[in-house]
Curated annotation (Swiss-Prot):
This is 3,4-dihydroxy-2-butanone 4-phosphate synthase. The keyword Repeat does not apply. HAMAP family: RibB. Mg(2+) 1 binds at residue 38. Catalyzes the conversion of D-ribulose 5-phosphate to formate and 3,4-dihydroxy-2-butanone 4-phosphate. GO terms for biological process: riboflavin biosynthetic process. Its EC number is 4.1.99.12. InterPro entries: DHBP_synth_RibB-like_a/b_dom (IPR017945), DHBP_synthase_RibB (IPR000422). The lineage of its organism: Bacteria, Pseudomonadati, Pseudomonadota, Gammaproteobacteria, Aeromonadales. The gene is ribB. It catalyses: D-ribulose 5-phosphate = (2S)-2-hydroxy-3-oxobutyl phosphate + formate + H(+). Pathway: Cofactor biosynthesis; riboflavin biosynthesis; 2-hydroxy-3-oxobutyl phosphate from D-ribulose 5-phosphate: step 1/1. The keyword Manganese applies.
């Protein structure tokens, strides 16, 4: 990864801190993974703070596959089965069946409806019957241990929410270029500057968590 493109956003520690501050304020952040992995950048929001306007931006500017990152505990609480029994995807992305709020939505496609579905899924005391399946929101199961276990956007999302002191659930979607191709780091930086959002890479988060663990130990 050409780290020089990230230099305007600070050093790795500063990039993580800026992302945490943005999430606490209800704003979005951009997370890029390793070049030898997906080599993509995701727009990420806190599930509890995301607004319909932000959802509309995500639908408009990104791939349209809006994913809700959930912990294994929440997946069990909602009794969400995995999308397939045997996952053969290259990066072992943990898709469950898709969901829709059982109440308070129309077709489930609009930005407001997707926010309603997300709020329903992360509500305290939520149960399986609060959701219909299938739907227009794609839950993702994060691996326990976060990015120190799997260096994926799903785990990065959960780790960021925990570090920010928020509910450990987030919403992500892959950023695309205007021509429909996937945005790489230069395009992610351009998007960040356009929308005044911080950028960090998963490597930054791994270093931050590792350093914190050393300090705590």
């Amino acid at each position: 990864m050409n780290q020089s493109l990230l230099t305007p956003f600070g050093n790795p520690f500063q990039r993580v801190e800026q992302a945490l501050s943005a999430l606490q304020q209800g704003n979005g952040v951009l997370v890029v993974d390793d070049e030898d992995r997906e080599n993509e950048g995701d727009l990420i929001f806190s599930a509890e703070k995301m607004t319909p306007q932000q959802m509309a931006l995500m639908i408009r500017e990104c791939s349209g596959i809006v994913c809700l990152c959930l912990t294994e505990e929440r997946i069990r609480q909602l009794a969400l089965p995995m999308m397939v029994e045997h996952n053969t995807s290259a990066n072992q992305t943990g898709f469950t069946v898709t969901i829709e709020a059982a109440r308070g939505v129309t077709t489930g496609v609009s930005a407001q409806d997707r926010i309603t579905t997300i709020r329903t899924a992360i509500a305290d005391g939520a149960v399986a019957s609060d959701l219909n399946r299938p739907g227009h929101v794609f839950p993702l199961r994060a691996r326990a241990g976060g990015v120190l276990t799997r260096r994926g956007h799903t785990e990065a999302t959960i780790d960021l929410m925990k570090l920010a002191g928020l509910k450990p659930y987030g919403v992500l979607c892959e950023v695309q270029n205007e021509d429909g191709s996937m945005a790489r780091l230069p395009g992610i930086v351009e998007f960040a500057n356009k929308h005044n959002m911080p950028v960090l890479c998963i490597e930054d988060l791994v270093a931050y968590l590792t350093e914190n663990a050393k300090a705590a130990g």
